[in-house]
Amino acid sequence: MTLIQKIQQQNNLTQQDINEFIQTLINPDIENEEKASLLSEYTNRPLNQVEVTYLVQAMIQTMYPVQPVYPEAMCVCGTGGDKSNSFNISTTVSFVVAAANVNVLKHGNKSITSASGSSDLLNKMGIAATHVPDVEGRMNETGLAFLNATDTYPVMKHIQPIRKMMDGPTIFNILGPMIHPYKLDYQVVGVFNPDFVKAMAETLYDLKRKRAIVLHGANGMDEATLSGDNLIYEVNQETGVTSYYLNAEDVGLKPAANGTLRGGTPAENLEITLDILTGKDHSSKRDVVVLNAGIALYVSEKADSIKEGVQLAQQLIDDGKAFEQYKKTGGQVYDHIG
C-alpha cells in the first residue's frame, strides 16, 4: 500500500510511515504538485496525538539528531494561521519576558498568512536572526535570541512553496512551534484551532517540557485575547496536563474585541511594539502583550500565578526594563518609522 493510500484510509501511521511522509516532502526531486496532494490529504485527516509526536521527532531528526541545550530556555510563539492580521504579539512579549531574566529563544518565521511575520518585524527592527552555533554566545550576552525557521531548518525551503499553494493552515502550522532546535524547558504556544490544543499539550509533555501552556485565544486567535474565555492546557512534567479557561478580567485587565489588536506592515507593527515597550501605549494592544507575557512569566516560574505574571509584566514595561531589553538585543529606535 502506498503512503497516500495509508493516509487516505485514516489508519494509524507508524513512526516509519511518518518518516517517509517527511522525507517525501523535503525531497527536492519530487514535484511540488505531488507533495501538495500528500500534504493536503494529511492535513484533512483527524488529528492523531501520537502521530503529532512522531512528526515532531521526524522533523527534528532531519537536522538535530542530538538537540542542543541552553539552561532553562523558553520559547513563546503562535502557530499562525488565525487570519486575524494582529500585530506581532509574541515577538513583543519576548522582550518583556526576557527583561525578567528568562532565557528566551524565540523560533519564528516569515509570514505565510499575515502581512508581517516575526522575521519581517525583526528585519525592520534591525535585529538579525541568530544562527544555531552562535546561540550560546548571544544568549550569554543578551538573554534573548531570535532563530529563523528557514535557517534552523533549511529543509523547510522545500516545504514553504507547497504551504503557499494551499488554501489555509496545514499540519506544519501545528508542528512549527514544537520543532524548536533546542530542547526547551519552558514553552507557551498559541494555537489557531481549539481542536488541536489538547494534542499539542500532550505532545509537549511527551517531549519532556518542564512546564508549558498551550492555548487558544477567545474568538479564534493564536494568542490569549481580551475578548472572552481563553482555552488553556497547562503542562507540568510532575503533575501532567490540566485544562481550564482564563478570562482577561480574572487577572485585572479590561475586555476588548480582537479587532482592536490589528497590525499592518512591518513598519506599522514596529511602531506598535515600540509604543508598548516605551510605555506610550495604554490601549488593548498593551494589555494583550501584558496578558501573554504574564502567562509566560508564570510558565517560566518567575511568578506564582498568571495574575502575578501580569503584574510583573506591567512593572517591567513601566520601569523601562522591557525597552532596555529591546535595545540590549540590538533593536533600533527611529525618529520616523517608514
Swiss-Prot record:
Give the catalytic activity. N-(5-phospho-beta-D-ribosyl)anthranilate + diphosphate = 5-phospho-alpha-D-ribose 1-diphosphate + anthranilate
The UniProt GO MF terms for this protein read: anthranilate phosphoribosyltransferase activity; magnesium ion binding
Q: Where does anthranilate 2 bind?
A: R163
Q: Does the keyword Glycosyltransferase apply?
A: yes
Query: What EC number(s) has UniProt assigned to this enzyme?
Result: 2.4.2.18
Whichever gene encodes this chain, its name is: trpD
> What function does the entry list?
Catalyzes the transfer of the phosphoribosyl group of 5-phosphorylribose-1-pyrophosphate (PRPP) to anthranilate to yield N-(5'-phosphoribosyl)-anthranilate (PRA).
Q: Cofactor(s) for this protein?
A: Mg(2+)
Sorted alphabetically, the Gene Ontology cellular component annotations on this record are: cytosol
- Keyword Signal included in the entry's annotation: no
Binding residue positions for Mg(2+) 2: D222, E223
Source organism (scientific name): Staphylococcus carnosus (strain TM300)
What keywords were assigned to this record?
Amino-acid biosynthesis, Aromatic amino acid biosynthesis, Glycosyltransferase, Magnesium, Metal-binding, Transferase, Tryptophan biosynthesis
InterPro entries with a match to the protein in the record: Anthranilate_Pribosyl_Tfrase (IPR005940), Glycosyl_Trfase_fam3 (IPR000312), Glycosyl_Trfase_fam3_N_dom_sf (IPR036320), Nuc_phospho_transferase (IPR035902)
What does the note accompanying the cofactor annotation read? Binds 2 magnesium ions per monomer.
Which positions are annotated as binding 5-phospho-alpha-D-ribose 1-diphosphate?
Answer: 78, 81-82, 86, 88-91, 106-114, 118
Q: What is the lineage of its organism?
A: Bacteria, Bacillati, Bacillota, Bacilli, Bacillales
Which parts of the sequence bind anthranilate 1?
G78, N109
Q: In which pathway does it act?
A: Amino-acid biosynthesis; L-tryptophan biosynthesis; L-tryptophan from chorismate: step 2/5
Chain positions recorded as Mg(2+) 1 binding sites: S90, E223
Q: What is this protein called?
A: Anthranilate phosphoribosyltransferase
